[in-house]
């Protein structure tokens, strides 16, 4: 399958469509998750798509396919059962998390192309620092030399996406040893910094957002303010 070219994959009438960008900073996981659910539940055909960028407090999240046996020793880090696809992963400081809240049918996108586009955005971002990112068949996400650098877990409800991608930038990777990441025993993880890339979250966020905008032909419009309760 060829890389997703948003200007070809997205419906022609929606190329260059506006999307709001919310830079949420450091946030606990659960309030952001609940806000994504509310946003998705109340949006209609006129709602503007949004991308939320966040750095979560330490948390393990267990997706719908997740098994508690893959959580080995969480210690002081909470475990939250969530409604995304996939297994268990870790979120924490130094990890860039992006939640695209998109109306996929309006963009002319199927789930497969959507997932492929997110992965391609990460791969293209890594390439800016001469890091070779790769896909793995039947295991969504992006890998470098067999180690996972970006985890992908999504949910699509009534054609609208929420949850998203978690990209390891410059973080303490020790908590990944307390789980079987994404349900795979012994799966190694890595980060942009460990591979010689930048440690600055703002630098990596700017690069990834530009690639996501390119993949899905967005024009991103930053907006201020937190989310309604």
Swiss-Prot record:
The BPL/LPL catalytic domain sits at: 45-220
Supply the alphabetized keyword list. Answer: Acyltransferase, Cytoplasm, Transferase
What pathway annotation does it carry?
Protein modification; protein lipoylation via endogenous pathway; protein N(6)-(lipoyl)lysine from octanoyl-[acyl-carrier-protein]: step 1/2
A Pfam match? LplA-B_cat
Catalytic residues in the record: 182 (acyl-thioester intermediate)
What are the site positions for Lowers pKa of active site Cys?
A: 148
Gene Ontology MF annotations = lipoyl(octanoyl) transferase activity
Family, as annotated: Belongs to the LipB family.
The protein's name? Octanoyltransferase
- Organism, per UniProt? Xylella fastidiosa (strain 9a5c)
């Amino acid at each position: 399958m060829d890389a997703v070219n948003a200007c070809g994959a997205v419906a022609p009438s929606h190329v260059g469509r506006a999307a709001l960008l919310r830079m949420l900073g450091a946030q606990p996981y659960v309030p952001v998750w609940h806000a994504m659910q509310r946003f998705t539940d109340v949006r209609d055909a006129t709602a503007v798509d949004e991308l939320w960028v966040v750095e979560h407090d330490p948390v393990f999240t267990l997706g719908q396919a997740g098994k508690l046996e893959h959580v080995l020793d969480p210690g002081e880090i909470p475990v939250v059962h969530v409604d995304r696809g996939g297994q268990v992963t870790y979120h924490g400081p130094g990890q860039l998390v992006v939640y695209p809240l998109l109306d996929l049918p309006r963009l002319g996108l199927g789930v497969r192309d959507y997932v492929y586009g997110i992965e391609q955005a990460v791969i293209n971002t890594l390439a800016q620092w001469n890091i070779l990112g790769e896909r793995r068949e039947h295991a969504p996400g992006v890998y470098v030399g067999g180690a996972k650098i970006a985890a992908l877990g999504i949910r699509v409800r009534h054609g609208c996406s929420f949850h998203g991608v978690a990209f390891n930038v410059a973080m303490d990777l020790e908590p990944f040893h307390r789980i079987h990441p994404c349900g795979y025993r012994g799966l190694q993880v890595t980060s942009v910094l460990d591979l010689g890339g930048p440690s600055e979250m703002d630098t990596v966020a700017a690069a990834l957002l530009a690639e996501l905008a390119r993949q899905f032909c967005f024009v991103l419009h930053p907006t201020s303010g937190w989310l309604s309760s």
